[in-house]
Amino acid sequence: MELMNKPLLVPLNTGIQGNVVMEENVRLYGNCELLNVFIGAFTHVASGAWLLNTDIGRYCSIGDGVHILTQQPTKMLTTSPIIYGDIFDELAMVATKAQYPVIRKTIIGNDVWIGSGVKIKTGLTIGDGAVIGAGAVVTKNVAPYSVVGGVPAKVIKMRFPPKIIARLNKIAWWQYKLTDYPLEWDDIDTVLKQIEQLELDKKLSLYVAQKYNVFKEANEVKGRPISP
């Protein structure tokens, strides 16, 4: 049975391993694989995404088939998993088992758009507001509000002019639940003025989203609320 209620939508065919935490108002689609992942509120993850040891901010759009790549050591005698006892336990001798390399956490900021089929090297930071074009292979950190694409991914342009980016960084709008307000989302200057005015009028309060531990049990996907 999939987890499908008001705060979360997580299909039954989602692979869930390790510590998976989601804020409310997260939407996942079929055949995603999650291992030690945090996903912030209002983030949408399309089908077939593989997310490994990754923190994802709020209001993100993760395209279908996005993969956070694993880290494979190249300085050892072999790159084969035969040396790790937990993978080939019946073959690896106790005396020769190697430590599996520590996988660095990948950080994806807030309001990030990642296109279909993007591959991201583990341990990178994708800045707030960044856009990654479909099919890109990301091998370096991505600066906030940059638009990147290609193999390997390179900066194509900045998403907004510097003055707009400065205003976006100042208000950090993702800390609010903006769905509660009638905003003109399609005009960046107008919507920023609206949010700035709401701040001046002290009508905005920080959105403290309910967090859930998400896990599988008895062929069901379950979400256990985490106390504040």
Name what the model sees in each region:
Residues M4-L124:
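Flexible, glycine/small-residue-enriched loop-and-beta-strand segment within the central core
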Residues L9-L12, Q17, P81-K121, P152-P228:
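C-terminal segments of enzyme domains that contribute to small-molecule binding surfaces
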Residues Q72-T74, V142, M158-R159:
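Conserved catalytic-core motifs of eukaryotic protein kinase domains, centered on the activation segment
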Residues W113, V131, V147-V148:
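Short-chain dehydrogenase/reductase
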Residues S116, A134, A143-P144:
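Catalytic-loop Lys-Pro-X-Asn motif of eukaryotic-like protein kinases
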